[in-house]
């Protein structure tokens, strides 16, 4: 039974913290609970083991002291007898103290005290092992051991009697530990390589420093008093849970798994509180540990990680799980709305804002401003959503229109060097250039096709090739044909930039410029009866490279008389002819039965009419100017009212003022309003000038 309690003691000691104070207190508690004979046996075994384990010098010094003490004891028998009598008195006094303490500390679970005692056979076996072990020691050690064994032999009978009189569980535990120590000591003679590891065994936790002399092992009355004070401080151990079960199936091993590994290892062992992670890291072929989040998330999720399992739907796998809103952005979760859905949302928001404006106007008798709308959080949200949806609608329409068109390469910046950019961009540009060269014709081929088209058009309309032989209508037709031809060229090759392109296209551009200037010069008509018409010289002809320019001489002023009538007749004739040619020009301008497509319209006739009106104002009298001024003011009020209504509606819908890009639906009205304002300023200047002239005269 003593051998069975020993593993329990070792396992309990494994679970205790290994602090020096606890070790010392545990040692005191064990010593205080044993009998005097057990203490003598403990001192004998400890001295034998220490002499083998510790250094030779210190053990040699101790053995020399012990040999001297043994010699002195053998020489004087009388002194030995007196010392033995004093020791027996001390032991009897100490046994009474221990008996009193055992009555307080013996647990109730130890009902059968006979199981916890050492019998005489075990004592004899212990004596034989001790004598055999000590017999192998050196001469100075043998002298000390023989003296101690003689004391043990003399007190053997007293040992058995004291065990029968005062048995304790701690005594049994101490005896079993000593038996294990002696067996370990016998193994040390065979395996000398495990000396350092056996020092760390839990059965040898109670040991003293080798430098301490052996005299400290002997008990004194002061030490007994000290031990009793320590016993009162150590908490009582409840061993009822361990001793309720009287029999065990298998003995508990003295070493734990981590202790056995540390005994065989060369490195320092880890503490018993080390976590599983350290042991996992020390094992090379171990599987990786699972994170704590795995157990919190649920072990059933491990079956969802296998994508090959049929019962598991795809949306339940972790990699298909939707990200939380805190990790993702709002832009990622936005749904793509179609243009029809965006239009419906815009209309609903506009209705909400309009209802708010009507309610606000009924309450406060004026239309809400932008600050009034911003003060209301709900209306402000509507306004922001409206602007956002409008932007999305615009982008969606632009995206749809871009999908219909072929992709265009981004044009290179002229400020960057040609070496700037990646090789991929250069390769793409080279490929695009090769494709363009293969598709589009050369500049010379395009010019030849344009000239051939112009010749066919002239032949159809019976129009001469020389501009001097053309009438006004033919010049207008030539101008439109040239304009469309040049636009067709620029749509293919762009405006001529290089010197070669300019040289090739120069005759066609010069012809178009000359025709345009002739038409603009013919549109300026002198006014009948105007005194300044006599002094106005015609516009200069365009300067053409390689040709001599001929200029008209200034017309001298004529005196008043019959010559005025001669000037008026050609003026009437010119006016009628110009009006007729202008009408023909407009008719010809609307004719688009040509092979070329023009993206822009020519607005020269409108300029002619504006110039004619302004020149008439200079010749008008003061009453005519005043009447014209009144008409312009009425027209200005009408257009201004129309524009103001448009701006108010825009502000109610969008919550902001009209910007320049928002004036596209009313572009004509804005342009007309600008011209009327300029005309009003001109009329005011003319009237003030006429007033000053009349006053001066």
From Swiss-Prot:
The keyword Phosphoprotein applies. The keyword Phosphoprotein applies. Residues 146-169, 412-422 have a biased composition (Polar residues). It comes from the Eukaryota. Keywords: Phosphoprotein. Residues 1-21, 52-112, 133-229, 307-338, 398-433 are annotated as: Disordered. Residues 86-103, 170-197, 398-407, 424-433 have a biased composition (Basic and acidic residues). Residues 58-78 have a biased composition (Low complexity). The modification Phosphoserine is found at residues 19, 271, 291, 401. PANTHER family: FAM13 (PTHR15904), PROTEIN FAM13A (PTHR15904:SF18). Belongs to the FAM13 family. This is Protein FAM13A.
